Amino acid sequence: MIALALLLQGSLPDSLPPKPAVAPSAWLSLIGAYASDHDTLYVYEDGGALVALLRPRAPMRLAQAAESLFTFSGRGPYDADRIAFRPGEIQVGQVVLRRLQMGPADGGQLRLQPVRSVTELLRIDHKLTPPAETGAFLAPDLVEPSRLDGTIRLDIRYATTNNFLGTVVYSSARAFLQRPAALALVRAARVLRPLGYGILIHDAYRPWYVTKVFWDATPPASRWLVADPARGSKHNRGAAVDLTLYDLATGAPVEMPSTYDEATPRALSDYPGGTSRQRWHRALLRRVLEAERFTVNPSEWWHFDFRDWQRYQILNVPFERVR
């Protein structure tokens, strides 16, 4: 109770440092991942300095010697003392590493070419039945968090063409969760509000037939990106939410280490790259939601599962029929 009271007064969650300064804009084009045939070297900003990380070595701070030349704080990777940045690559000693294109630009979206017509799949899969389940499940009680707290906003990508299939999938831009999960999200929003942040939901309850559409439309080699409809997903149970933070003062989404729905290492919940502020935003979101007993998906910093998801069964109710 004491910790919650402190949060409601605008204090940061335990173990979270103060909000870092914005990284110098000149460094943003240098930050990223660079690869040779054998290694991947990450360049990121931490505490107002550029840092180079080549695992299993410890991170090494860089000092700027010229516009595109930095020196290591000690003997660097490949026994080098400096790192030179060039368009599309870096040189560390005698080793040249090419810059990896890790994902879409800020605000962009992963795209796949559907192998079947999404419109046709929506018509067909809508009529199918989810896999049978047995157990003592709780009765479904789906509610809309945005109706419980006015600071919770929506950017439902599957109700637009700005999603991985490039096609509208949802019939309306709505987000439902089982009531206990929705109330937990409202409590999280109340914690974030004094800190100047609100919650922006990208997806929540997903009818099972939509999961089937995703599976059927996705190329087989890329199906690791989507849930298997034979097992259903936590989204189908109304117990998972995809979300980020937005700035209450401007209404703009905050910067995170990756874009939403990005299928690259930047999406990992512990990805070390990016800027201090991006990682701080990610950590703030995670700390506040974990305090409400959500669990982050290690592969997707934006995806959180509610603690009691196993107690709810797979649902296939269209948004318009949710009562």
Residue ranges of model-derived segments:
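Bacterial N-terminal signal peptides
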Residues: 1-9
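Sterically constrained small-residue positions within well-ordered secondary structures
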Residues: 5, 25, 34, 43, ...
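Peripheral terminal and inter-domain segments
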Residues: 9-120
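K/E-rich alpha-helical interaction surfaces of small helical-bundle regulatory domains
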Residues: 28-40, 289-293, 300, 305
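A mature extracytoplasmic/lumenal domain signature
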Residues: 47, 56, 66, 158-160, ...
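Extracytoplasmic cell-surface/polysaccharide-interacting catalytic and binding patches
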Residues: 105-202, 217-299, 308-323
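Beta-rich nucleic-acid/ligand-interaction surfaces
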Residues: 208-214, 304-311
